[in-house]
């Protein structure tokens, strides 16, 4: 999809389904390269545990972005490239595991729309805030969404410059 073509249609958000995983993996590879490519099994497990927090963005029938989120406790960040075994019994936060937009659709508001959907889910679930791990080049976007850096170590695999961020629920 060309930039002009992607700009012509406003993205439509819908719940993510298991049969969307091949398209999700293609966007993940285009967005991050091979270094952060997670398997369909890892992403499918997150989808199975928290389907209400996983969304897909489409434009003109093509997939242009996605977000995987899930309830999470106070313990930093979940490991990358490892399937979640279970969700915490008491979820203090909504955790944005991955939000990616196809390169052709960047700058069109897709990321903000996807984040808005999971923010509404997390706020509605009564979480006291949201957390995520931001890659260095995404930090400005997350700061604009109200996130601040939380000092501390991350599990291996998140890469140089990645940091844990948190956003408190707004009244």
Segment roles from a protein language model:
Residues 33-59, 68-86:
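Active-site rim helix/loop that mediates acceptor-substrate recognition in acyltransferases
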């Amino acid at each position: 999809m060309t930039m002009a073509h992607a700009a012509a249609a406003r993205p439509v958000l819908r719940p993510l389904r298991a049969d969307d995983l091949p398209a999700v993996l293609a966007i993940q590879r285009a967005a991050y390269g091979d270094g952060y490519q997670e398997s369909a099994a890892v992403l499918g497990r997150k989808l199975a545990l928290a389907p209400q927090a996983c969304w897909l963005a489409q434009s003109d029938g093509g997939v242009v972005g996605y977000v995987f989120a899930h309830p999470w406790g106070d313990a930093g960040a979940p490991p990358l490239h490892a399937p979640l075994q279970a969700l915490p019994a008491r979820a203090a936060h909504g955790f944005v595991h991955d939000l990616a937009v196809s390169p052709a659709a960047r700058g069109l508001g897709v990321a903000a729309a996807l984040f808005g959907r999971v923010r509404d889910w997390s706020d509605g679930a009564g979480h006291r805030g949201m957390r995520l791990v931001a890659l260095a080049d995404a930090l400005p976007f997350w700061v604009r969404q109200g996130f601040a850096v939380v000092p501390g170590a991350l599990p291996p695999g998140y890469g140089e410059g990645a940091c844990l961020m948190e956003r408190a629920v707004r009244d």
